[in-house]
Amino acid sequence: MFIAHRGLYDDNIKENTIEAFDNAFNNGYQGIEFDIRLTKDKIPVVLHDSFLSRVFGIKGLLKDFTYQELLDKKDIHIPKLEDVINRYQNKVMIIELKEKIDITKYLENPKNDYYISSFNYDYVSCLKKSINYKLGVINYVLNSAVDYSKLNFIMILDTIYNQKLFKFKELEIVIYGVVGKINDYNKELKYIV
C-alpha cells in the first residue's frame, strides 16, 4: 500500500490540500497522510506548519486566524479535517496531530481506516483506544518514556528496524519515508519503493 505524505503535490499543487489528495488518489495511492492544527476559533484544519508563509506566502500564524478569515484570503485553501474525512470515504488516512486536539468525534465512520499519530506521545496518549481508529507515535527509535500498551502502532522514520523487536509488543509497524511506504515524492517514485 502506498500513502502520499501531505498528498501528491508539486509546484502547481500545494501540499495538504484537497487538490493534492485528489491527485494522490488519481495516481494510484491508497491513502494519504496529513497534519492537523487548530485555527483561532478551534476548527481542526489540515496544515503542516504553524505559520502560513512557506506554503501560502502570507505572514502570520495559523492560530491567529479564524477559519472564516482564512477563507476570505485569496489563494489560501486550507481544508477542514471534517471535509477531508467526508470526501475520502473508504480510504486510509494517517492523521498527524501537531498539537493536542481531540479529533475522535470526526472519526466515527468505521468504513475508513484511520491512523492517528504524533511525534508527541502526550497528544495521542490522552485519546481513548477505539475500533474506529488506531493510535500511534512517530519516532526514530523506541522510547522508554512511551507506554506502548496504549498504542496500536509505531511509525519508524528512516531507520533500520527489527520486526522481532516489535512483535512482542504486538504493535503494527508502519515504516515512514523513502525506505517504506509513505513518501512525499513524485508519482514515479511510488513505483520504485
Labelled PLM ranges:
Residues M1-V193:
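Phosphate-group recognition and catalysis centered on beta-loop-alpha active-site segments
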